């Protein structure tokens, strides 16, 4: 039986009584974002909108993004990535569970020095896919060229974010490339493996 949207009690400053609000809204008030599902346009629009709002509220205070995602849409993920770089606050990224494909890309895209993984996290890199290619031969050729362009650009960005040579990135992502939390730290996807939330908050 579905339990619906989790709700938690929250009391506004100066109010005598608490009200029930969604868990997501409560986390947003603490400047915490949680990507806990496949990344699609709807999720990206929500995450982008919240980041823009939090930026307008306090451009100096960190935004914390927890990631437990199998990946998803390249275009949706890049919308989140570009917004992470567009807003002024540092973006703290924390992998809990798994960060695969675009989830791993966003994990690595956090502010340098503020990218974390919990001890039993699993990270997976692989080459991007723009979905099934169908249509006329000319359409297939156009889509194939675009796939190669996106792949090249994402590999270049991963090389910048991790410090790995581009040639190594290109080799590693040809097939699913799994890393433990400590291996992800050595690779440059995260900066530290942490035990407690306070470690991430401390930066």
Curated annotation (Swiss-Prot):
Q: Does Cytoplasm show up as a keyword for this record?
A: yes
EC annotation? 3.4.21.92
Q: Give one GO biological process term.
A: protein quality control for misfolded or incompletely synthesized proteins
UniProt keywords (A-Z) are: Cytoplasm, Hydrolase, Protease, Serine protease
Q: Where is the active site?
A: 101 (nucleophile), 126
Class of enzymatic activity (EC top level): hydrolase
Task: List, alphabetically, the GO terms of the cellular component aspect.
Answer: cytoplasm; endopeptidase Clp complex
Q: Which reaction does it catalyse?
A: Hydrolysis of proteins to small peptides in the presence of ATP and magnesium. alpha-casein is the usual test substrate. In the absence of ATP, only oligopeptides shorter than five residues are hydrolyzed (such as succinyl-Leu-Tyr-|-NHMec, and Leu-Tyr-Leu-|-Tyr-Trp, in which cleavage of the -Tyr-|-Leu- and -Tyr-|-Trp bonds also occurs)
Protein localization = Cytoplasm
A GO MF label = ATPase binding
Primary localization: cytoplasm
**Mind telling me which InterPro entries this protein's record contains?**
ClpP, ClpP/crotonase-like_dom_sf, ClpP/TepA, ClpP_His_AS, ClpP_Ser_AS
Q: How does it assemble?
A: Fourteen ClpP subunits assemble into 2 heptameric rings which stack back to back to give a disk-like structure with a central cavity, resembling the structure of eukaryotic proteasomes.
Functionally, this protein is described as follows: Cleaves peptides in various proteins in a process that requires ATP hydrolysis. Has a chymotrypsin-like activity. Plays a major role in the degradation of misfolded proteins.
The UniProt family comment states: Belongs to the peptidase S14 family.
Q: What is this protein called?
A: ATP-dependent Clp protease proteolytic subunit 1
Where does this protein come from, organism-wise?
Synechococcus sp. (strain JA-3-3Ab) (Cyanobacteria bacterium Yellowstone A-Prime)
């Amino acid at each position: 039986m579905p339990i619906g949207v989790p709700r938690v009690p929250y009391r506004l400053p100066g109010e005598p009584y608490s009200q029930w609000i969604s868990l997501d809204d409560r986390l947003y008030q603490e400047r915490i974002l949680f990507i806990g599902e496949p990344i699609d346009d709807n999720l990206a629009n929500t995450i982008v909108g919240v980041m823009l709002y939090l930026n307008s509220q306090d451009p100096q205070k960190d935004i914390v993004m927890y990631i437990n995602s199998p990946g998803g849409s390249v275009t949706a993920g890049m919308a989140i990535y570009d917004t992470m770089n567009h807003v002024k606050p540092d973006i703290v990224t924390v992998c809990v569970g798994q960060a695969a494909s675009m989830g791993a890309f966003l994990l690595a895209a956090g502010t340098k020095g503020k990218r974390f993984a919990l001890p039993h996290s699993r990270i997976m890199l692989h080459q991007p896919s723009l979905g099934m290619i169908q249509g006329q031969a000319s359409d297939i050729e156009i889509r194939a060229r675009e796939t190669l362009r996106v792949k090249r650009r994402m590999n270049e960005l991963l090389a910048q974010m991790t410090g790995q040579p581009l040639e190594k990135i290109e080799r590693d992502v040809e097939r699913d490339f799994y890393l433990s939390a400590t291996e992800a730290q050595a690779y440059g996807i995260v900066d530290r493996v942490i035990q407690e939330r306070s470690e991430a908050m401390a930066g």
